[in-house]
Amino acid sequence: GFLISAMHRMLMMADTDAQKKNIKKKQLHGFELQSNMFAVAAANMILRKDGNSNLECCDFLRKKPAQVQMKGATVGLMNPPYSQGTKADPEQYELSFIEHLLDSLTDGARAAVIVPQSSMTGKSKAEQAFKKNIMKNHTLEGVITCNTDTFYGVGTNPVIAVFTAHEPHDADKVCKFIDFRDDGYEVRAHV
């Protein structure tokens, strides 16, 4: 979803065939841990003629941020796994994924992540530490509260958090909070 949508948007903004070719070959990168989801994502990109699926079947958290930064990403989109973090495995908290994504982007890059609302508060000590590091090194621009049925049947209240990478959050910064729960859509189960 994210890569396909991003590719289509970028292609619509491109003026020349050379720009379109460059977008398809060099400007889209993705990481997927699960091999079955990786296969679906790669097939979708190939079917949409992306030219070169820069997808990797790997653990994104094992990638060194400096290594990923060399790809020159100016936008990061992420939907990390929900509710996987524990005291024994704090690296799996959503805030850990957010911090790693932001650290992996270029200076001034923008990131949008969709996570459970509860993860943004950071309840555990580990989550509080991730949150502190994020705010120390990056700026939270705003949070959009989504419809509770965005992920039908999951029972979570999703939000989209928007960040600017590598610009420390100013304590006087006014963040935008948008309530988009009434998005005008009606959820119909598997219709």
Question: What are the residue ranges of the model-derived segments?
Answer:
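Conserved S-adenosyl-L-methionine
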Residues: 1-78, 83-91, 95-96, 103, ...
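A conserved structural/catalytic subdomain of Rossmann-like adenosyl-cofactor enzymes
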Residues: 62-191
